[in-house]
Regions:
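Chalcogenol-based redox active-site neighborhoods
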Residues: 1-164
Length: 164
């Protein structure tokens, strides 16, 4: 068993299909923006919907702070498309149907079988700067991630973050 990704590690690169069916590679999203990568159990569940809508409601704050939000679950790209449309989600959802990326990050399963809910803040260089792991504290995922993104914005203005 792998130890999973830790703060300070390079984020494992991957390519997965988005809700539009287009392949998305993590490495291609880094460089200009911080990536907030959140893993959640499933679309259209109470927790999955609450978390996605919380990220949606704070989406402008994330983009203003120089971050891109990306959600990952085992749902298909088609299911993600319906979920994103239904809840007006402005960010990318990725289909990790085999759980390969979840395993690469070491996202734990709740109760041993429910896919976990973990958020990673990855800086422009691809380094994991923060991990928040909680199945029940949905607001914590959004609030902590935004706080870290804003801190990175002030710490790393030379990397192209807007300041002020």
């Amino acid at each position: 068993m792998t130890r999973g990704v830790q703060v300070g590690d390079k984020a494992p690169d991957f390519t997965l299909p988005s809700q539009s069916g287009e392949p998305v590679r993590l490495q291609d999203r880094l460089g200009e923006r911080v990536v907030v990568l959140y893993f959640y159990p499933k679309d259209n569940t109470s927790g999955g919907t609450a978390e996605a809508c919380a990220f949606r409601d704070s989406y402008e704050s994330f983009t203003d702070a120089g971050a891109e939000v990306i959600g990952v679950s085992s749902d298909s790209a088609d299911r993600h498309a319906g979920f994103a449309s239904k809840h007006r989600l402005p960010f990318t959802l990725l289909a990790d149907q085999g759980g390969r990326v979840r395993k690469a990050y070491g996202v734990p399963a709740a109760l041993g079988f429910i896919p976990g809910r973990v958020t990673y803040v990855i800086d422009r260089t691809g380094t994991v700067r923060h991990i928040f792991n909680s199945m029940t504290n949905i607001d914590g995922h959004v609030g902590e991630a935004l706080e870290v993104v804003r801190k990175l914005q002030t710490e790393q203005p030379a990397l192209g973050f807007p300041v002020g």
